[in-house]
Amino acid sequence: MSKEIAKKRIEELRDLLNTFNYQYHVLDNPSVSDAEYDRNMQELIKLEAENPEFMSEDSPSVRVGGTVLDIFEKVTHKSPMLSLGNAFNEGDLRDFDRRVRQGIDDANVRYICELKIDGLAVSLHYEKGRFIQGATRGDGVTGEDITQNLKTIKAIPLRLNEEVTLEARGEAYMPKRSFVKLNEEKEQNGEDVFANPRNAAAGSIRQLDPKIAAKRNLSMFVYGLANVEEKTIPSHSESLDFLGELGFKTNPNRRTCETIEEVIAYVEEWQEKRPHLDYEIDGIVIKVDDVALQESLGTTAKSPRWAIAYKFPAEEVVTRLTGIELSVGRTGVVTPTAELEPVRVAGTIVRRASLHNEDLIREKDIRIGDYVVVKKAGDIIPEVVNVIFDKRTGEEEEYHMPTHCPACESELVRLEEEVALRCINPTCPAQIREGLIHFVSRNAMNIDGLGERVITQLFDADYIRTFADLYSLTKEQLLQLERFGEKSATNLVQAIENSKENSLERLLFGLGIRHVGAKAARTFAEHFETMDALVKATEEELKTINEIGEKMAQSVVAYFDNEDVLELLQQFKEYGVNMTYKGIKIADLQNVESYFAGKTVVLTGKLEVMGRSEAKKKIEALGGKVTGSVSKSTDLVVAGEAAGSKLAQAEKHNVEVWNEERFLQELNK
């Protein structure tokens, strides 16, 4: 076959396959059999392999998955992906309607209602009609680049019907039938199954190997247009029509409503129809349709005033409580958990539900053998709502919390002003295991590849009993464990070695000192600079530090007044674990060349690791100026959790937005 003929045939096959994809995955109206589709795809793949000079990034063949990635790159959203306020009942919806009408002086308002797809929010960027990048929502400010995985989703067009530059946003999801099939395959292979379709979709999209995502049969509904060049669209409903014309899959079940009564009727209708859909929904999104009215209403500190998400009530089911088991946390708290006859709740099989503490068991009069009502709090965490007393037979057994720890047999105590029972034995194996899991976690030593499963394996094999034991692990020991090969063992040993270089605040937080969170750990690290200096500090010295109270000061002094802890610190030294603060102190910032010099910065939302007052001091010490509002003169917005109206202002004025992680990286350069 000549090059000219091959090129022509490749173009024909691409057009044909794009048409097939659109008919099947967007219109839900397939025109060819799977076998015919596969034959055309295989022919295209073969021709492109033989003629690589004709390969194109938007070829349908890229949907089978490409090169395995090493890591997902971070992406800062051009405009933040904000969350919505919630409504839980008819009264909340009427309050929303009242606020909207007050905000626009009772002008005529039309709402658009859409199904709230329970999947993974993503953004899609197109340049002159070509798909160039896709990213997860992340924290709303910064997400992860998942372009290669999104290319495997056939409902996402790789080339639009117009050469337009835009950003669309939507929800990637896994159809119920695909979820059932995937879990059946996992069970047959002896693998852990996914809890629900949402987790399955999120887990599939975040695979470093796009070929895995390609096999998972994901789909996507686009629900909004974040921005589009050289085009003004007056309403949200028209923007959805426009997206459909471009080739996107939009949900066909949307409806415009002239009154709040029509909105409520739509909500009730889909609450009934919900089980019959082939995808999960967890509510209804209601928006003011007119874009000009949206801009007039603006946003609050947390969410837009022109939209709200109605959350369906948590599904409640009845099952039998067959027993109560106990778990011991890293701080020694003993928590009771209900063992249940397996029952499906909100799309997943539930076998256990939290009972929180002994007082709750007494308050609800929960007994072993009772029939109980179970729901998922926030559609996530199973909990026992109440007992069905009418079903009692008299054979149910009252439950009494033990007097001794289920893990080590030490006597349990209830500390003053606490409802929880605690094991205060420092050598309790359950506490040690949970403490190890905390030590390696993301905000602590952040050891990649060391999660709960591996820690449990190492603990059960008696390879680790203290934090310091992690630093004596060898590749040979890891190779003795299930699911470890040469590469994974080598990578984990290297990750543990890398963690030795962490700054002091990570080590302090990882130790799990009572009352000391990530923010306090950073405060101590910056103030004392070395572990030795902190160990020698008195309670009075600690209390002089801003935001350190008596309880925390006493806890820190008591922690270090322990021979076992001092021995642990000595072992850290011998293994070469860094115990000094590597961050920048405010006093040292005056002479540092900094990005922040001459910049105007706005801080918004809750900063987890560094408080806003501390962040303000550091920015000012680096020559920056911190203001309380966003304007055209603002250079940067640093956004923590629950950031709201200032993000919208940043978008309006085209101001760069960083999350806390990006901010800390710049500070520590």
From Swiss-Prot:
Its cofactor is Mg(2+); Mn(2+). The keyword Chaperone does not apply. Residues 591-669 form the BRCT domain. Zn(2+) binds at residues 405, 408, 423, 428. PROSITE patterns: BRCT (PS50172), DNA_LIGASE_N1 (PS01055), DNA_LIGASE_N2 (PS01056). Keywords: DNA damage, DNA repair, DNA replication, Ligase, Magnesium, Manganese, Metal-binding, NAD, Zinc. GO terms for cellular component: cytosol. One of its GO terms (molecular function) is metal ion binding. CDD domains: BRCT_DNA_ligase_like, LIGANc. Its EC number is 6.5.1.2. The active site is at residue 116. GO terms for biological process: DNA repair; DNA replication. It catalyses: NAD(+) + (deoxyribonucleotide)n-3'-hydroxyl + 5'-phospho-(deoxyribonucleotide)m = (deoxyribonucleotide)n+m + AMP + beta-nicotinamide D-nucleotide. It comes from the Bacteria. InterPro entries: BRCT_dom, BRCT_dom_sf, DisA/LigA_HHH, DNA_ligase, DNA_ligase_AS, DNA_ligase_CS, DNAligase_adenylation, DNAligase_N. NAD(+) binds at residues 34-38, 83-84, 114, 137, 171, 287, 311. PANTHER family: CHROMOSOME TRANSMISSION FIDELITY FACTOR 18, DNA LIGASE. DNA ligase that catalyzes the formation of phosphodiester linkages between 5'-phosphoryl and 3'-hydroxyl groups in double-stranded DNA using NAD as a coenzyme and as the energy source for the reaction. It is essential for DNA replication and repair of damaged DNA. NCBIfam families: dnlj (TIGR00575), PRK07956.1 (NF005932). Belongs to the NAD-dependent DNA ligase family. LigA subfamily. This is DNA ligase. It comes from Bacillus cereus (strain ZK / E33L). The lineage of its organism: Bacteria, Bacillati, Bacillota, Bacilli, Bacillales.
